[in-house]
Amino acid sequence: MQQPLTPVEAAAIILKACQELGAQIYFDEDVFVQTLRGSNTHPVRFFNLKTLRCFGALSELKAKQLLDGILWLIEDGYIDRVEEDRPLLLVAPNAFERIKTADLAEFASILGMWKKNE
């Protein structure tokens, strides 16, 4: 049986997905995410990380673990928190420029593990 992803691994997958979508992500206590493109007033889709097929690797993680991983990325400057009262997270424009080559290799292995769970 495969081990659940660590909070940092989960956050890395989310960050990678956000880069591909060019998206902002909202986290609430139920781990629902709203992705937005272009404008805060035009939502693209809602999905739940626990049930969405392509995020199956995250199914055993609790909301707190995901948020811990996201907060780790905020603290390291990979994601900007742009609202305090509601945890709206915006991928920083320079986030991927700041990730080291070793981190990118780790991303690739994490994403490989994620795809095996599809």
What are these regions (language model features)?
Residues M1-E118:
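Accessory DNA-binding and partner-docking regions appended to nucleic-acid-acting proteins
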